[in-house]
């Protein structure tokens, strides 16, 4: 008994002795987690400081005596507005600020009107009329929140409308200064909302539209990364490291990105024109592209199942389809990288994308030829090659899906006014033309051959661009369709 008591006592003192070191380790671990969280997105720290600035500015309604005399305790509504309205992005702040401002204005006006209307029915009829109006408008506003469009863009405004109307209408029954109360509430909310919007826009703004733009381009890059590493994943899995394998599977995050994309697109519509994005930028087109990207990610997820499966086709069959499969995955990956770069830089590079897609289609034809030449002779052979054939068919679907993504981006680029990238063929001709002008070129004039000695050598170069009909731009740059030069 004494031994157990001594052991418990020793254990207690040991825990007490270890407590400072454990506390230090725990605090250090938490500090490192906070530092890592802040480094992942430094804008979070800036946003926190911006909220602090907005709260400090709006608190002047209490600190400055003339402002306090004007607004009194209703200045608290301005502080409350800053807390609930200030969002991480400019679009989020504008959405909540404008919703709150207009909802307060409309609900306040209706509330004052409801109070004056109810007073016509006398002291006994006034609460009955107010109760009917509060019930009717409150129920109607609540029902409107179920409509998808209102739910998506004006849900917060409908909520504030219900709150403000009920507050003004019910308070008006016990006070005669209903107009003053409504004015002070509206004024302080507008002051708080305006401060939020100004701080959000002019101090290190975070644009939802820019985040959406980068997100779509990065998601397309994730698809490209997987397709470029597909050959090694499927045909040579033993040579792929764990880090590389996890890197190429980044596409999995695309499968759960729909809610984030919808939210960013909705907030981006509230934002004014900024940077490369004009006032009426086609934000809805991002959702169309995102849907196709997600569809492609679903195909890759199915494809990844065959990569991880132990049920593979015979080695002889895989060796026949390896070359077209490799070409197909590599080319379609390059096409996706070009599309992602086009979105990031907002430059239309259709020639490069078309070239890679055409190459992938040629690889599909070669794959079909290889499959026909490997037609199984027996039922058993057919069962053995099914995994390989299924994998190939899914990869063909991926190519078709990438082509749809490109078509959607091509449509989007016209609406978003992407800059045109100079065609590669025209660029080569321009470079050759400029090179000729830098060298020593002596033109051949009529009659020169008669004057000069017959032993002199001339090389007459006549350039006919037969296979290429120059556009108006090409003619302006190159000067003419036919060039005659003499190299001495």
Curated annotation (Swiss-Prot):
GO terms for biological process: malate transport; monoatomic ion transmembrane transport. Pfam families: ALMT (PF11744). The chain crosses the membrane at residues 45-64, 66-86, 101-121, 127-147, 160-180, 189-209. It is found in: Membrane. One of its GO terms (cellular component) is membrane. Malate transporter. Belongs to the aromatic acid exporter (TC 2.A.85) family. This is Aluminum-activated malate transporter 8. It comes from Arabidopsis thaliana.
């Amino acid at each position: 008994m004494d031994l157990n008591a001594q052991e418990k006592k020793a254990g207690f003192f040991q825990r007490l002795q270890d407590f400072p070191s454990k506390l230090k380790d725990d605090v250090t671990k938490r500090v490192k987690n906070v530092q890592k969280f802040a480094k992942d997105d430094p804008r979070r720290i800036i946003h926190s400081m911006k909220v602090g600035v907005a709260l400090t500015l709006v608190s002047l309604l209490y600190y400055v005596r003339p402002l306090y005399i004007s607004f009194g305790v209703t200045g608290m509504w301005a502080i409350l507005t800053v807390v609930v309205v200030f969002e991480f992005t400019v679009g989020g702040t504008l959405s909540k600020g404008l919703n709150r401002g207009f909802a307060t204005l409309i609900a306040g006006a209706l509330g004052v009107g409801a109070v004056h209307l109810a007073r016509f029915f006398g002291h006994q009829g006034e609460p009955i009329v107010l109760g009917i109006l509060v019930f009717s408008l409150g129920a109607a506003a609540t029902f409107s929140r179920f409509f998808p469009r209102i739910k998506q863009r004006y849900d917060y405004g409908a909520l504030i409308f219900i709150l403000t109307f009920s507050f003004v209408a019910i308070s008006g029954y016990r006070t005669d200064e209903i107009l003053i109360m409504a004015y002070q509430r509206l004024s302080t909310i507008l002051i708080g909302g305006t401060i939020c919007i100004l701080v959000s826009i002019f101090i290190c703004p975070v644009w939802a539209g820019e985040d959406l733009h980068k997100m779509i381009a990065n998601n397309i890059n994730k698809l490209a990364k997987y397709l470029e590493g597909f050959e090694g994943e499927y045909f040579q899995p033993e040579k792929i490291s764990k880090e590389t394998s996890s890197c190429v599977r980044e596409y999995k995050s695309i499968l759960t990105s729909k809610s984030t994309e919808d939210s960013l697109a909705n907030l981006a519509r509230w934002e004014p024109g900024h940077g490369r994005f004009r006032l009426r930028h086609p934000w809805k087109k991002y959702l169309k592209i995102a849907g196709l990207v997600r569809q492609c990610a679903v195909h890759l997820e199915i494809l990844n199942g065959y990569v991880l499966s132990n049920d593979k086709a015979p080695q002889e069959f895989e060796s026949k389809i390896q070359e077209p499969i490799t070409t197909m995955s590599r080319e379609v990956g390059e096409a996706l990288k070009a599309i992602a770069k086009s979105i990031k830089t907002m430059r239309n590079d259709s020639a490069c994308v078309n070239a890679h897609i055409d190459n992938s289609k040629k690889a599909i034809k070669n794959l079909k030829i290889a499959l026909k030449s490997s037609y199984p002779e027996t039922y058993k052979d057919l069962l053995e090659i099914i995994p390989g054939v299924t994998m190939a068919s899914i990869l063909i679907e991926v190519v078709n899906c990438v082509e749809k993504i490109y078509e959607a981006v091509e449509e989007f680029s016209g609406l978003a006014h992407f800059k045109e990238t100079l065609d590669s063929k025209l660029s080569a001709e321009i470079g050759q033309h400029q090179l000729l002008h830098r060298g020593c070129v002596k033109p051949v004039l009529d009659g020169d051959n008669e004057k000069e000695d017959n032993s002199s050598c001339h090389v007459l170069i006549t350039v006919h661009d037969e296979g290429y009909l120059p556009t108006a731009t090409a003619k302006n740059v190159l000067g003419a369709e036919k060039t005659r030069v003499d190299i001495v």
